[in-house]
Amino acid sequence: MTKPLVSLLMAAYNNVAYIKNAIDSAKKQTYKNWELIILDDGSDDGTWELAEVLSKGDKRIKVHKNGVNIGYNSTMLKLSGLAKGDFYAHFDSDDMLERYAIEEMLLAFEQLPDVKFIYSDFAQIGKKGEVEHYSPSPTFDPNKLHQHGWRHFGMYRSDVMEHIQGYNEKLASTNGCADGDLFMQIVEKFPAARLPKVLYLYRNHGNNISTKNAKCEACPLRMDCNFARVWCKSANYDITTFKPIEVHHGIEDIRSLEPKN
């Protein structure tokens, strides 16, 4: 039986200190039918050059480079156009995968044929790879989408891209909202599930993109953001003011709320 191809999408920018660890963790995967697509976003610290060297001898690793820095969201948009897999997974260039990450994910998808998106638990590691803490993800609840967001390790069936907007070009000027925006597009329409195993090592080095994101209430682009739209709908918030929608009871409504004797 043909084994599905998994596309690991890696946007890289000035991570020369960590990208070797990331690529090595892909090479060590127990599941072998994957492609790692690296798109360097104009690094000036040698990240692209090192990735080129590390890709030699392994045709599964494909290294590309933007002519100029275009930002994380636009880079992820380009990466999705290069991928050929049956499944897509986001893999940051400063992080690492547990060696059985892809295999475990595919086993879960096999057991859950109707599920389109699966996310795992992860461990946060420091600059030198030391484990700082474990981060269990919440169990997925489609009625509480505002309690969810992109979680590592996240993998989804590539055919969902035919039914959603995809990477949001309107967020091109932001630095790291592509993952959350895409996540909400998927889970708004399709079933998702949590795999309660630590499959991903998220590196905290003080310069992470996710720590620089504007909060939704302060983001000038939230009206164009699927994450904010779905979050507000689920949490019963007004996306314009980013405040809870007040419920005004009429006289009959108030009477119905009074305790019965």
Please report, for each region that a protein language model flagged, where it lies by residue.
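Glycine-rich, basic loop-to-helix element that forms the pyrophosphate-binding segment
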Residues: 66-83
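Short, acidic, metal-binding catalytic loop of nucleotide-sugar glycosyltransferases
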Residues: 24-33
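Cell-envelope/extracellular polymer assembly enzymes that use nucleotide-activated donors
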Residues: 4-7, 35, 181
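Short aromatic/hydrophobic "clamp" motif used to bind/position activated sugar donors
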Residues: 88
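Conserved nucleotide-sugar donor-binding catalytic segment
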Residues: 141-223
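N-proximal low-complexity "stem/linker" segments adjacent to membrane-targeting elements
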Residues: 1-25
